[in-house]
């Protein structure tokens, strides 16, 4: 009985709340203009935030064509030739027999530009300067010993002092030749790496040819041994 009374009370309570609850027409955000009644001034706009969602988005420059113009393809690059963008299927087998890796050396030399000539000359000077610097460092004692004046018996004359300045002048010339940009070193390293790759390619081709010859030789030897064994067995059975 108590449970029935409780359920009836809760139902009447919820009905009363639903009937007496009202949704306000507006929600005040700030207390500004709190003393002014908006009903007395209908022309004054009520401060608030209005959000409008557009029906569609049109790119600028295409609104005059039609009411619902199709947007342009953004992935397409204007001014590009469509035929040039076609992709070719790669070959299934890649071989070096038709065109080896050192085909650049077989072709005619590329026209040398003044910049490339300067880079090559600077690279050669740098390598020569490094070699001469190493030789001077290794033979520094010999140079100093040779540059020292030699005194003979009964004579007070000596070698002129200008010989002492020879190593200094050589080192100064080396410093001037070693002053260059890192791009020259990169180009020299790329050229040496390219030569090493070409040499490795040639060695690989020679090894492949030797391997093919060895396989052929082994096949012929195995076939001769098998034929010889078959002939011996046939002659033995004939006896």
Curated annotation (Swiss-Prot):
Residues 184-214 form a coiled coil. It is a single-pass type IV membrane protein. The keyword Transmembrane helix applies. It is found in: Mitochondrion outer membrane; Peroxisome. GO terms for cellular component: mitochondrial outer membrane; peroxisome. Residues 238-239 are extracellular. The chain crosses the membrane at residues 220-237. GO terms for molecular function: protein homodimerization activity. This is Mitochondrial fission factor homolog B. Plays a role in mitochondrial and peroxisomal fission. Promotes the recruitment and association of the fission mediator dynamin-related protein 1 (DNM1L) to the mitochondrial surface. Belongs to the Tango11 family. Residues 115-130 have a biased composition (Basic and acidic residues). GO terms for biological process: mitochondrial fission; positive regulation of mitochondrial fission; protein targeting to mitochondrion. InterPro entries: Mff-like_dom, Mff/Tango-11. Residues 1-219 are cytoplasmic. PANTHER family: MITOCHONDRIAL FISSION FACTOR, TRANSPORT AND GOLGI ORGANIZATION PROTEIN 11. Keywords: Coiled coil, Membrane, Mitochondrion, Mitochondrion outer membrane, Peroxisome, Transmembrane, Transmembrane helix. The gene is mff-b. Residues 107-139 are annotated as: Disordered. The keyword Transmembrane applies.
């Amino acid at each position: 009985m108590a449970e029935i009374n409780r359920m009836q009370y809760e139902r009447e309570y919820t009905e009363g709340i639903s009937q007496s609850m009202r949704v306000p027409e507006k929600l005040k955000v700030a207390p500004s203009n709190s003393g002014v009644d908006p009903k007395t001034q209908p022309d004054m706009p009520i401060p608030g935030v209005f959000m409008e969602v557009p029906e569609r988005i049109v790119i600028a420059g295409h609104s005059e064509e039609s009411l619902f113009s199709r947007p342009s393809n953004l992935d397409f690059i204007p001014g590009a030739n469509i035929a040039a963008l076609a992709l070719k299927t790669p070959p299934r087998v890649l071989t070096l027999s038709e065109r080896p890796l050192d085909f650049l050396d077989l072709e005619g030399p590329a026209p040398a530009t003044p910049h490339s000539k300067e880079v090559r000359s600077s690279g050669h000077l740098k390598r020569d300067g490094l070699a001469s610097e190493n030789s001077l460092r290794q033979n520094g004692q010999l140079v100093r010993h040779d540059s020292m004046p030699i005194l003979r018996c009964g004579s007070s004359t000596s070698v002129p002092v200008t010989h002492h300045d020879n190593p200094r002048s050589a080192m100064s010339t080396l410093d001037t030749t070693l002053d260059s940009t890192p791009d020259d070193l990169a180009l020299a390293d790329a050229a040496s790496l390219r030569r090493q790759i070409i040499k490795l390619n040639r060695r690989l081709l020679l090894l492949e040819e030797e391997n093919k010859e060895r396989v052929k030789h082994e096949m012929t030897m195995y076939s001769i041994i098998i034929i010889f064994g078959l002939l011996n067995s046939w002659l033995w059975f004939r006896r």
